[in-house]
């Protein structure tokens, strides 16, 4: 069955506000099924998992279900799923627990293309424990991380490499396979942030061979919950515990505080939403995710191609980067018009976009020196008619 965008739009009552939402890189709209699930779960699962009473058992079941749902999302073992408030929080906890990998004589590699959530924790850990920091640089023409640089960056002293699988600012997709092999050859770990790619691509931690991956549920319309997943759950034991519970085991060793069980129920509902984007999808949740994400990808590729052709038709618009592989996210500048003014003009026309994402890559490319960049991204409910509205509003700036 073809992707039915009208049906998908019907799953999001908030689209009734009349706004055109091209601000997907900041998080997609919450489907009604997720909002309803969260509300119901907060009424039923308010207690912690400690105890033998029904509410505690329901909370424990919600926690288990959330780990299983995230595991299906990334093709992993539920025993390796760590849950928390946000991927930035989880990565900070992981970095805090990584003293054995960030000490004197060791090296940590981070990327200029990443969100700050996957940079700042490792910089702090390196400063605290004495490791040397190396940077994977961006090709200023394409906006990608060139694969040739990994051989010169990775050494016997490398203990950890942190990268994203796709940029939430430029949209470029990172080639992970060659890099992960080099990293593993020296006994180091690879931490991959999938937050930008998760709404658009079927994730597979085994296929990329990453050791740890992170996602943010709000990226695809889930609640504000992050997940950090270990390909091999036993690797968690090589990190120090950050839990306030001295008896914590497994994922709980890297979790702090009491879980928000209502939000965790929403994570499950949001992954079910992804698995049902294509009504024809059948089978296990992982199988339904594979079908639905493929259908969504095919649809969004058509809309994104139309968006790119339309933007290139505007003489004052300059696209930033030319990645070969791309999620449906793009940044651009408008000649002699600051990004915040462009975004305000779009808002005046009922269109939401993002001015200056805060990514270091915009500084590297010199974009912030000439007024900054506007970032737009498609969501599962985006249409070609909305692209036309965006282009008309941008054309009015000329």
UniProtKB/Swiss-Prot annotation:
Judging by the UniProt lineage, the source's domain of life is Bacteria
Query: How does this polypeptide assemble, per the annotation?
Result: Homodimer.
Q: Which GO terms describe its cellular component?
A: peptidoglycan-based cell wall; plasma membrane
Functional description taken from the UniProt entry = Is essential for optimal growth.
Which species is listed as the source? Mycobacterium tuberculosis (strain ATCC 25618 / H37Rv)
As for family, the record states: Belongs to the class-V pyridoxal-phosphate-dependent aminotransferase family.
Q: What is this protein called?
A: Uncharacterized protein Rv3778c
The record's Gene3D superfamilies line, in alphabetical order, gives: Aspartate Aminotransferase, domain 1, Type I PLP-dependent aspartate aminotransferase-like (Major domain)
**Pfam family, any one:** Aminotran_5
Q: What else is known?
A: Was identified as a high-confidence drug target.
Please give the InterPro entries that the UniProt record associates with this protein.
Aminotrans_V_dom, Cys_dSase-rel, PyrdxlP-dep_Trfase, PyrdxlP-dep_Trfase_major, PyrdxlP-dep_Trfase_small
Q: What happens when the gene is disrupted?
A: Cells lacking this gene display impaired growth.
């Amino acid at each position: 069955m073809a992707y039915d965008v009208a049906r998908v739009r019907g799953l999001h009552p908030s689209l009734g506000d009349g706004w055109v939402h091209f601000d997907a890189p900041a998080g997609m709209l919450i489907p009604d099924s997720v909002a309803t699930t969260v509300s119901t779960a907060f009424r039923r699962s308010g207690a912690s998992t400690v105890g033998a009473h029904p509410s505690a058992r329901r909370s424990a079941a919600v926690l288990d279900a959330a780990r299983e749902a995230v595991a299906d999302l990334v093709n992993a073992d539920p025993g390796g799923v760590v849950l928390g408030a946000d991927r930035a929080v989880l990565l900070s906890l992981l970095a805090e627990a990584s003293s054995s990998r960030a000490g004197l004589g060791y090296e940590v590699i981070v990327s200029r293309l990443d969100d700050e959530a996957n940079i700042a924790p490792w910089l702090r850990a390196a400063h605290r424990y004495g490791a040397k920091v190396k940077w994977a640089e961006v090709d200023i023409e394409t906006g990608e991380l060139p694969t040739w640089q990994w051989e010169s960056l990775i050494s016997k002293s490398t203990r950890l490499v942190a990268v994203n699988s796709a940029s939430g600012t430029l949209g470029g997709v990172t080639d992970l396979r060659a890099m992960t092999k080099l990293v593993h050859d020296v006994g180091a770990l690879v931490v991959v942030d999938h937050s930008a790619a998760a709404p658009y691509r079927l994730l597979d931690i085994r296929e990329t061979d990453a050791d740890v991956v992170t996602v943010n549920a709000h990226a695809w319309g889930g609640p504000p919950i992050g997940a950090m997943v270990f390909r091999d759950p036993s690797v968690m034991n090589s990190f120090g515990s950050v839990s306030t519970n001295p008896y914590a085991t497994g994922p709980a060793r890297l979790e702090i505080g009491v879980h928000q069980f209502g939000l965790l129920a929403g994570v499950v509902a949001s992954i079910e939403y992804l698995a049902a984007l294509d009504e024809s999808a059948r089978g296990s949740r992982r199988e339904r995710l594979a079908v639905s994400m493929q259908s969504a990808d095919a649809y969004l590729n058509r809309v994104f191609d139309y968006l790119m052709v339309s933007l290139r038709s505007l003489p004052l618009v300059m696209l930033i980067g030319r990645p070969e592989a791309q999620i449906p996210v793009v940044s651009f500048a408008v000649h002699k018009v600051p990004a915040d003014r462009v975004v305000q003009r779009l808002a005046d026309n009922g269109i939401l976009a993002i001015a200056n994402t805060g990514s270091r890559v915009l500084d590297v490319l010199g974009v912030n020196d000439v007024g900054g960049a506007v970032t737009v991204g498609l969501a599962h409910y985006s249409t070609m008619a909305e692209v036309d509205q965006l282009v008309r509003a941008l054309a009015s700036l000329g």
